[in-house]
Curated annotation (Swiss-Prot):
NCBIfam families: xseA (TIGR00237). GO terms for molecular function: exodeoxyribonuclease VII activity; nucleic acid binding. GO terms for biological process: DNA catabolic process. The lineage of its organism: Bacteria, Bacillati, Bacillota, Bacilli, Bacillales. GO terms for cellular component: cytoplasm; exodeoxyribonuclease VII complex. Its main location: cytoplasm. This is Exodeoxyribonuclease 7 large subunit. It comes from the Bacteria. It catalyses: Exonucleolytic cleavage in either 5'- to 3'- or 3'- to 5'-direction to yield nucleoside 5'-phosphates. It comes from Staphylococcus saprophyticus subsp. saprophyticus (strain ATCC 15305 / DSM 20229 / NCIMB 8711 / NCTC 7292 / S-41). Belongs to the XseA family. It is found in: Cytoplasm.
Length: 445
């Protein structure tokens, strides 16, 4: 007669088959989150679905804490998980190890999170922006060595302000190596003592422009001492490099316009300034000539002796008064000096010095006693605190028979943080024990 299996036995057998299948231990799944719930324990429970199917899923707290975004109902996600059977209900489900946003949505969310972080840290503050020089002598251009961007920048600068020397620094603007190359070239340009730096490239997708959203690139632009114009992408494209740069240009051509004055406008301005200056000088000379003619007509200038006769007499009177004043001052100083000399008593002065020395010695002894007493009190107080601290240390606590429980490198303080089959580490006074939870019993059960 055939032996009947219990439901539990059959379920355990099916679970065993799932757990032994290597293809089910690490699977990559793409789908939409539904029925998403975050338990008070920190574990996540949800379904993953597409148009035709639904799979139950859960994610333990330790793995959930590593998610780099805030998952919610309806998110399209990429999952790395293992497939197993939940014995209590007898259905299969996935246990998720890693979760990421699917595709471009992840990039936009990452961009927004980084923008908020850098804004909070002050990287985009206006008070950090540097002024672009009006008349640059040397401009560094950081972009790809070939393409429309470098051609437009060179053509525009040569047309507007050929006096400016252009330093072309070929830079990777796309690909895995671009981030480090952009940072290196920014530092290189900053060390060249140029007046302005233009960072530019043509348009592209968010993936193409992503190197200009990297935090390290933003910090390199922020720390650069040379004013920077960012011209990354087209007019509708925005990167974090645009926000941190001193000026943002919609296109590489506009960046070249912002970096230079227009030579034709300068010539027109200089011509106008020359006319205005010439007209001002003529008017000024006419005014001064009229004033000189008016002054020359005064009667004193017609008889020059009237200008200095009275001044000579006034000088003689002042010289006489000065001599009398000096003689009187010298006499008074001599009388005061003689009076001080007569009143000076050398013996009294020595006695006062000796008395002050005795007073100082007494105060020195008293101060030394106070300092020794204070130092002894501080030493005794420190010894008592060290003794109290030693009594409260975890090592002394374990010497009295207590054990510290850790799970996922975190100290467990409540049975509510544990579940059956959890792997835990017990730290005792003489070593460490790796253990597994068989059953959890709470005091309120």
């Amino acid at each position: 007669m055939s032996e009947y299996l219990s439901v539990t036995s059959l379920t355990k057998y099916i679970k065993y088959k799932f757990d032994q299948d290597p293809h089910l231990q690490s699977v990559l799944i793409k789908g939409e989150l539904s029925n998403f719930k975050k338990h008070s324990s920190g574990h996540l429970y949800f379904n993953v679905k597409d148009k035709n199917s639904v799979i139950s899923a859960m994610m333990f707290k330790g793995n959930a804490s590593k998610i780099d975004f805030e998952p919610k109902e309806g998110d399209e996600v990429l999952l790395e998980a293992r497939v197993s059977v939940y014995e209590r209900r007898g259905n299969y489900q996935i246990y998720v190890n890693k979760m990421h946003m699917d595709g471009i949505g992840n990039l936009y969310q990452k961009l927004e999170q980084l923008k908020k972080k850098l804004t909070k840290e002050g990287f985009f503050d206006q008070n950090h922006k540097k002024v672009i020089p009006k008349f640059p002598q040397k401009i560094a251009v950081l972009t790809a060595g070939t393409g429309a961007a470098i051609r437009d920048i060179h053509t525009t600068i040569n047309s507007r302000y050929p006096l400016a020397e252009q330093v072309q620094i070929n830079t990777l603007v796309q690909g895995e190596q671009a981030k480090s190359d952009i940072i290196e070239k920014i530092n290189q340009a900053d060390a060249l003592n140029v007046d302005t730096i233009i960072i530019g490239r043509g348009g592209g997708s968010i993936e193409d422009l992503w190197n200009f959203n990297e935090e390290d690139v933003v910090k390199a632009i922020y720390n650069c001492q040379t004013p920077i114009i960012s011209a990354v992408g087209h007019e509708t494209d925005f990167t974090l490099s645009d926000f941190v740069a001193d000026v943002r240009a919609a296109t590489p051509t506009q960046a070249a316009v912002m970096a230079t004055p227009d030579q034709y406008e300068l010539r027109q301005y200089l011509q106008q300034a020359n006319l205005s200056l010439t007209r001002f000088i003529k008017q000024y000379m006419q005014q001064k000539r009229k004033h000189l003619e008016h002054v020359a007509s005064y009667y004193k200038f017609q008889t020059p002796s009237l200008l200095y006769d009275q001044q000579i007499q006034k000088r003689d009177d002042l010289e006489k008064q000065l001599k009398l004043s000096l003689n009187l001052k010298i006499k008074n100083q001599q009388q005061q000096l003689q009076l001080l000399f007569n009143n000076f008593n050398l013996k009294t002065f020595k006695q006062r010095i000796k008395r002050d020395q005795l007073t100082n010695n007494q105060k020195r002894v008293e101060l030394s006693k106070v300092m020794h007493n204070l130092l002894d009190n501080q030493k005794n107080n420190l010894a008592r605190k060290l003794e109290n601290l030693n009594n409260l240390s975890p090592t002394n606590t374990m010497l009295r028979g207590y054990t510290i429980v850790n799970k996922d490198d975190k100290v467990i303080t409540s049975t509510k943080d544990l579940a059956e089959n959890d792997n835990i580490v017990l730290t005792m006074k003489d070593g460490v024990v790796d253990a597994q939870v068989k059953k959890v019993r709470c005091n309120d059960e």
